[in-house]
Amino acid sequence: MIKQAIIPLAGLGTRLLPLTSVIPKELLPINGKPNVEYILDECIDAGINQFIFIISKNKQNIKKYFFNDKFYKKIIKKKSDQRIINEFKKIKKYQKMIKFVYQNEPKGTGDAVLKCKKLIQGNFFMMLLPDDLIIKNNCTKEMISLYNKKKSSIIATKTINKNDVSRCCLLYTSDAADEEDS
């Protein structure tokens, strides 16, 4: 059973500069909620309850976002706003599930995942790249279900336009594999 997720967050975020020189892209709000929270909520809904965040020294704001109890308590004390109280409760729930690993030099995704080796329990985990947000269905739940059927590694992919090829990783598949899982 898959209960852990690795989430690499140490990237430089250069495509969104200059905004990401101030705010990590993972904390950029989408409809009032940081991107990384969408990932956490989807994973929790899929049964994952342990997260390993890979960050760099330049991404301390991510750690601060989730572990800034003193700030929340100070605000709640001054202003008894139910929305803020609810946010704090949600953050406290996340705190129990998150561990941090540092990747101080950008040596790629493989290096980042290798840094998590000591924290991985068992042989199975999810790795979620926070660059693309999939709103439609719970992709994590679907991937776990497919993994349980196939008992092999699963990769979520999407078809892209030729104009976007330079910004993406390419994956070539055989026709037989395409037909099997369509």
Language model features: what each stretch is:
Residues A10, P130, A177:
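Single, functionally critical "micro-switch" positions that shape active/binding sites
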